[in-house]
A protein has these predicted regions:
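Solvent-exposed, flexible loop/coil segments flanking beta-strands in beta-rich domains
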Residues: 1-43, 48
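A structural detector for beta-sheet-dominated domains
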Residues: 37, 48-52, 100, 111-113, ...
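Terminal beta-strand-rich extracellular "head" domains
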Residues: 67-106
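Beta-sandwich interaction modules
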Residues: 95-122, 126-131
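"Short basic amphipathic alpha-helical interaction patches in structured regions
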Residues: 60-65, 78-87, 110-113, 137-141
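Short consensus segments that form the blades of beta-propeller domains
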Residues: 54-58
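C-terminal interaction-tip segments
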Residues: 1-15, 118-120, 127-151
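Internal, hydrophobic beta-strand segments that form the core of beta-sheet-rich folds
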Residues: 41-51, 61-69, 116-141
């Protein structure tokens, strides 16, 4: 009988440059400035974020989405959110993470997001549903990828 296991994940790497996540208004999304390629052929990724202290209010969640590189090899997803803009990505893989409505730093991790096929480019999009503009510094978001193994 086979057993399904997870492979050892890669080390965490930046999903966004730190400055990209600074001062994002509540209700806005931002496309990562870092282009990623699934050259390892990994199937899953975990995404972890740390937000500097702010007075977070309801609605209180962070959304994380994956925009694939389109056939034109220059546009990701629907082409929105190259700069911070109002709205939530629709029609693309994503997940939300609840955050506490309080004045404090916030952290969260989502697990097992499906990655695009091997060799395909993609970027992450982060949605601020925290009810307040992000702090002007010290916001970070990283990811790691991995596969499953059947032994």
């Amino acid at each position: 009988m086979s057993t399904e296991l997870w492979t050892t994940p890669s080390a965490y790497a930046d999903a966004f440059s730190t400055a990209t996540l600074n001062s994002i208004a509540s209700g806005n999304s931002i496309l990562s400035d870092l282009a990623l390629t699934n050259t390892n052929g990994d199937i899953f990724c975990d995404v972890s974020f740390n937000l500097a202290s702010a007075s977070f209010l309801a609605p209180n969640f962070i959304g994380i989405f994956i925009y694939p590189l389109n056939k034109d090899t220059s546009t990701y997803g629907d082409g929105r959110f190259g700069t911070s803009a109002a709205g939530i990505p629709s029609g693309y893989p994503g997940i939300s993470v609840g955050i506490t409505p309080t004045t404090a730093a916030q952290s969260g991790t989502v697990s097992r997001l499906l990655l695009p096929a091997m060799g395909c480019g993609y970027k992450f999009v982060l949605y601020n549903g925290g009810g307040v503009t992000f702090a002007s510094s010290a916001n970070t978001c990283q990811y790691r990828s991995y596969n499953r193994a059947v032994v």
